Amino acid sequence: MNESVTVRGKDRYKSGVMEYKKMGYWEPDYEPKDTDVIALFRVTPQDGVDPIEASAAVAGESSTATWTVVWTDRLTAAEKYRAKCYRVDPVPNSPGQYFAYIAYDLDLFENGSIANLSASIIGNVFGFKPLKALRLEDMRLPVAYVKTFQGPATGIVVERERMDKFGRPLLGATVKPKLGLSGRNYGRVVYEALKGGLDFTKDDENINSQPFMHWRERFLYCMEAVNKAQAASGEIKGTYLNVTAGTMEEMYERAEFAKQLGSVIIMIDLVIGYTAIQSMAKWARKNDMILHLHRAGHSTYTRQRNHGVSFRVIAKWMRLAGVDHIHAGTVVGKLEGDPATTKGYYDICREDYNPANLEHGLFFDQHWASLNKLMPVASGGIHAGQMHQLLDLLGEDVVLQFGGGTIGHPMGIAAGATANRVALEAMILARNEGRDYVHEGPEILAKAAQTCTPLKAALDTWKNVSFNYESTDTPDYAPTPSVSV
């Protein structure tokens, strides 16, 4: 169906139930404006439901429609405010699923509010009965809307200047075990890891303020460790102090205490919610603090490819919201992420402009209107033996976090940190010399290990350990041959 079937005139407002595609939510001739917000949904209609009607229903229920005609539409600029589904395509290699392109007038959204944006785009419509499943795959956010957001509080360039670290990925580690350590022992882990050569250590997502370690105790021991490690190494160090708490008042209190102790970075979890994230981002910019976001909880709605929200959308929202770091996948680690999709996430974080790239899952051009860049973080199941792969796949502007790959080292935590630092420095040197470090990686590491016992022990311990499972979320596109004329 390529023509509009919208009912016009007085018949449009007759009382009763009308198909969404006839109410103006299906407009195949519509040309999206530069100022429109565009959403791409993967729609899976119930058996027997017309995909055009299902897609029009998504447009309607995520903008101005309800289940019946209401005469109060005539008191508004109804034709302007209706979301318009203008294109529906079958999803390649996925029978019964359709890509629905929907345009929303910018006036439908409050400036600078992820909460308001998401209330429409992923609100009630996700429970709509005529749909088996619904997934928000991607969005095009107009420059006029992007400019209403703060963007990353610090950004990659200023973070590197603040840390005085250039020309290589940053190195970190999550303290393990994530729960159960006393404050004193927690601080010992932080000191050993930083002294051994890491740039950062990190609280895990669920370490807040528990009976075995109060948050204030953790902050004090951690910052004592940071200061000692800085004095011992002559380098600037940091530890992500997780300020996540039950209320905003408590989070602000913890953040202020971290600032008083001289921390350069604090951390929050995605589960605190979009408004809380934006609030902490504003605090971080005001107080010259790097803000790390752990994406705890995201896989509950990002991992399944037919229902939920793609992580590429969450990455876009978090760049708008103003965090400086976000976990974005490792490819070779233990967590979900295929190479092409993960590359798309990293592009969203680090580029000023994202051209559409279906191979990477990017359906739209996206201009970031000079917002600061967001530093992606790779963590979960990575180790020194993968350094050449990580540098090749993820690039230079990334934090590589080796938690188990540092703290699980057979010679101890400091040795684990040293192994990772030496492996990285060896790989960066090889890259700068123009060597084919991707294919020569194992040889480069083996040579570096000849003069670094901790690296040799790491390579002997983890060898070729990798987590090679089929990804559940891969790009949907069908390559077609080009014809040269």
Curated annotation (Swiss-Prot):
Catalytic activity field: 2 (2R)-3-phosphoglycerate + 2 H(+) = D-ribulose 1,5-bisphosphate + CO2 + H2O; D-ribulose 1,5-bisphosphate + O2 = 2-phosphoglycolate + (2R)-3-phosphoglycerate + 2 H(+)
Keyword Oxidoreductase listed: yes
A biological-process GO annotation: reductive pentose-phosphate cycle
Record-marked site positions (Transition state stabilizer): K334
Keywords, ordered alphabetically: Calvin cycle, Carbon dioxide fixation, Lyase, Magnesium, Metal-binding, Monooxygenase, Oxidoreductase, Photosynthesis
EC number: 4.1.1.39
Quaternary structure and interacting proteins, as annotated: Heterohexadecamer of 8 large chains and 8 small chains.
Miscellaneous comment as given in the Swiss-Prot or TrEMBL entry: The basic functional RuBisCO is composed of a large chain homodimer in a 'head-to-tail' conformation. In form I RuBisCO this homodimer is arranged in a barrel-like tetramer with the small subunits forming a tetrameric 'cap' on each end of the 'barrel'.
Protein's name in the database: Ribulose bisphosphate carboxylase large chain
Gene: cbbL
